[in-house]
Structures are given as structure tokens and as C-alpha cells.
Amino acid sequence: MTDQQSAAQAKLRALENAPVGRLLWEYSLPTVVGLLVMSLYNVVDRILIGRGVGADAISGLAITFPVMNLATALGVLVGAGATTRVSILLGQKNHRGASEVLGNALVLLLINATIYISIFGIFIDPILRAFGASDATLPYARDFILWLLPGLLMTNLAFGFNNIMRASGYPRRAMETMILGALANLILAPIFIFVLDLGIKGAAIATDIAMTFSMIFVMAHFVRRDVTLRFTRGIYRLRASVVLSIVSIGAAPALVNAASCFINVIINNSLARYGRSEERRVGKECRSRWSPYH
């Protein structure tokens, strides 16, 4: 057995034999810390857009929440289901099955991203109008979402495989990937918004780049030889049984995100009659609550 295989086996033995209380602490603390750090995405974007672009931009930002909710729902459909299946299969010592889930999850996320990026990119104006955009907020919403769309692929890959990383025995490393993305966004957002004077586009571009950093860090983990689960040949062909097992588990949390989309659509359209000040107020509240894979 090589050193890399020994390290991977040691991780699995720790999951099998360590006290439950210790495992709970080791896995829950990095998760909580990582999620708190990720909230910086929302806080930083909201503050900088408000100061650098204006109050109307916050209203436009609120219109984009349903789009992000739908994209997140598709990511959760795969990410949450794959994470649970990986945990179960590793517990059963079925490493081949866990690897197939990993490969199928990658293909499904890429397919999902291609579909929603294409649909939103082609029909963005009618979609935003249906989601409550007015003549004043549409330009801001369009600018933000068109630049953010490519980054939603990176977001789904980063968060989906971040959860799988945690489930396969690497909670601290999973936390580090989220911290990396948040810090990158904290540095890049002011540069793109103020220094380069790109406004709301700059916020979206900074988020895209930050999530790309996180995605690269996450995906690099799964090509290492010393991990419990890695990308290998022969795991990317979609199998109906594997896809069904992923989707059946991920459907419930995905529906929660989809429901958030429809709630936001109703709120946006209801507020349109009251004017932009109310939209801005609710937009700030919604932005504070929204985060990918919440």
C-alpha cells in the first residue's frame, strides 16, 4: 500500500472509530465557520454596491434573487443528493459506488449549468420582467445577472463538491475553500467597483473570480492521490440508478430553494406598486438572507 493510500485509509478509519462527540465537533465547527465567512459575499456586495452605484442598484439586485434561487436549486438537487450518497456508500465501504456518484455529480452539474445559463442568457429580459423588474431596475438587474451567470457554474461546482469533500473526511479543507473565496471577493470587489469603475458589473465579476478560486481549490482536492475519494477513469458515464439516487435525495432541499424563488417573485411584483424605496428596503433584507447552498 502506498503512502497516499495509507493516508486515505487513515481518514476512513477515523470516521469509523473516533468518538461521535469528537467527530461532531470536528465537522460542525468548520462548517459553521465557513458559512459565517461566506456571508461576507452578501454583506460586502450590498455595502459596496450601495455606496458605489446607488440605491436603485440595490432594488435591481433584489430582482435577481429568484434567478439565483433557481440556479441554486439545480445545484442543490445534485450537490445535496451526491453528498448524502457518498456518505452512505463510504460507510458501506463501497468506494467504487462513491466514486461513481462523484463522477455522475460532476456531469449532472455541468448539464444543469449549461441549461440554465442558456435559458437565462437568451430570455433574461422577459424573465426579469416576470420577476418584477421595472424600467428603473431592469438595467441594474440585467447587468448584474448577465455577468454573474458564468459564475453560477463555478458556485455550484464549488459548493457541491465542497460538501462532498466534507462528507469524505476533510471538513477543515472544505472550510478553507470557502474562506479563500470570501477573502478573494473581499479584495476584488472594491477594485472592480471603485478602482475600475465597473459598478454593479464589477461586483458580479469579482464574485465570479472569487468563486472560480474556490472551485479550482475544491476540484484540485479530488485529483490528489492521498484522498479518500478522487476523480478516476470510468466514473463519468451517467447511470440511471446513480442519477436517481442523487436526485431523489436532493429533491427536497432543491424544492425549498425553488419555493424561495416563487416567494421572491411574489414579493417583487407586489412591491412594484409601492415604489423603489420599498423595493430597496426589502432588497436589503432578502440579500442578507440569501447565500448559495444555505
Residues covered by each model-derived region:
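Helix-terminus/linker motif at the lipid-water interface of multi-pass membrane proteins
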Residues: L40-S59, L128-D135, I191-L198, C261-R281
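Short alpha-helical transmembrane segments in multi-pass integral membrane proteins
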Residues: M1-T31, V86-L153, A184, I193-A251
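Small-residue (Gly/Pro/Ala) motifs that create kinks and tight helix-helix packing interfaces
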Residues: N162, L188-A189, I193
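Small-residue-rich hydrophobic transmembrane alpha-helices
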Residues: I58-S118, T155-A174, N268, R281-G283
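Transmembrane helical elements of multi-pass membrane transporters/channels
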Residues: E26-D45, W147, G181, A210-S214, ...
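Conserved small/polar residues in nucleotide/adenosyl-binding loops
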Residues: E279-C286, H294
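Hydrophobic/aromatic residues within the transmembrane alpha-helices of Major Facilitator Superfamily
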Residues: L36-L40, L70, L74, V78, ...
